[in-house]
């Protein structure tokens, strides 16, 4: 079953393009890009989510990330 998002593909793609442009501008390696993405996720959780919910949300985020990689393999 597909996941339905409250955000449009256009919203997500615009922000992703801007973030990608910043990483390209700074010639960020894949390792640095992933480190930055991880730090952003950590900061969002720590600053915007109750401590009691952080671990559960982080686990769901990790599951979604892994799932998105597995989906790519089948194409």
From Swiss-Prot:
A Pfam family reported for this protein in Swiss-Prot or TrEMBL: DUF1414
Top-level taxon: Bacteria
InterPro entries per UniProt: UPF0352 (IPR009857), YejL_sf (IPR023202)
Similarity section: Belongs to the UPF0352 family.
NCBIfam families the UniProt entry points to: PRK13689.1
HAMAP family (UniProt xref): UPF0352
Name this polypeptide is given: UPF0352 protein VS_0950
Naturally occurring in which organism (per UniProt): Vibrio atlanticus (strain LGP32) (Vibrio splendidus (strain Mel32))
């Amino acid at each position: 079953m597909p996941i339905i998002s409250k955000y449009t593909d256009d919203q997500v793609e615009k922000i992703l393009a801007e973030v990608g442009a910043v990483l390209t501008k700074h010639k960020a390696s894949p390792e640095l890009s992933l480190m930055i993405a991880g730090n952003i996720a950590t900061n969002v959780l720590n600053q915007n989510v109750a401590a009691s919910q952080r671990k559960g949300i982080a686990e769901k985020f990790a599951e979604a990330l892994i799932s998105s990689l597995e989906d790519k393999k089948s194409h």
